[in-house]
């Protein structure tokens, strides 16, 4: 039982996933710091407030606690867009470049798909069954 658990944990996918989660958490901290300490102060210089949280806040009814906070939504949306852009330009673009260089080195052309081995095997089985009948 312990051997099976050890084999499961040491599989490449589980280890890769664990590394990705740790690196993702660290990267999230870096991007959050970028947004909170660099980008939002720049926006505060333009808008006049450190975030949009209080910019478009509308009270609904007579209860002061009942507010529609459009500015808070815009702040979160802006944070999301900045984080997505940072991930795209700092992770996706370099990885695509590395993959393209590796494919060029191996002689794999862009758009050229290698067939799935399972599909190839199933095609061979189908052809063998056709030739029998």
Curated annotation (Swiss-Prot):
What kind of membrane protein is this, topologically? Multi-pass membrane protein
User: InterPro entries given for it?
Assistant: Mechanosensitive_channel_CS, MS_channel, MSC/AndL, MscL_channel
Alphabetic keyword roster: Cell membrane, Ion channel, Ion transport, Membrane, Transmembrane, Transmembrane helix, Transport
This protein's major location comes to membrane
Q: Which residues cross the membrane?
A: 14-34, 73-93
What Gene Ontology terms describe what this protein does at the molecular function level? Answer: mechanosensitive monoatomic ion channel activity
One GO cellular-component annotation of the UniProt record comes to: plasma membrane
Q: Where in the cell is it found?
A: Cell membrane
- UniProt xrefs under Gene3D superfamilies: Large-conductance mechanosensitive channel, MscL, domain 1
What PROSITE patterns does this protein's entry cite?
MSCL (PS01327)
Q: What does this protein do?
A: Channel that opens in response to stretch forces in the membrane lipid bilayer. May participate in the regulation of osmotic pressure changes within the cell.
Q: Which family does it belong to?
A: Belongs to the MscL family.
The protein's assembly and partners: Homopentamer.
NCBIfam families listed in its UniProt record = mscL
Q: What is this protein called?
A: Large-conductance mechanosensitive channel
In its UniProt entry, the species of origin is given as Renibacterium salmoninarum (strain ATCC 33209 / DSM 20767 / JCM 11484 / NBRC 15589 / NCIMB 2235)
| Record lineage | Bacteria, Bacillati, Actinomycetota, Actinomycetes, Micrococcales
């Amino acid at each position: 039982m312990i051997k099976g658990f050890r084999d499961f944990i040491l599989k490449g996918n589980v280890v890769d996933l664990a590394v990705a989660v740790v690196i993702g958490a660290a990267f999230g901290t870096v991007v959050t710091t970028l947004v909170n300490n660099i980008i939002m102060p720049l926006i505060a210089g333009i808008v006049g407030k450190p975030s949009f949280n209080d910019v478009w806040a509308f009270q609904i009814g007579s209860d002061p606690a009942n507010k529609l906070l459009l500015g808070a939504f815009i702040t979160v949306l802006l944070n999301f867009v900045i984080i997505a852009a940072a991930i795209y330009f700092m992770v996706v673009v370099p990885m695509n470049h590395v993959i393209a260089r590796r494919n060029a080195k191996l002689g794999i052309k862009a758009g050229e798909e290698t067939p799935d081995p399972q599909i190839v095997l199933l095609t061979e089985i189908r052809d063998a069954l056709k030739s029998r009948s």
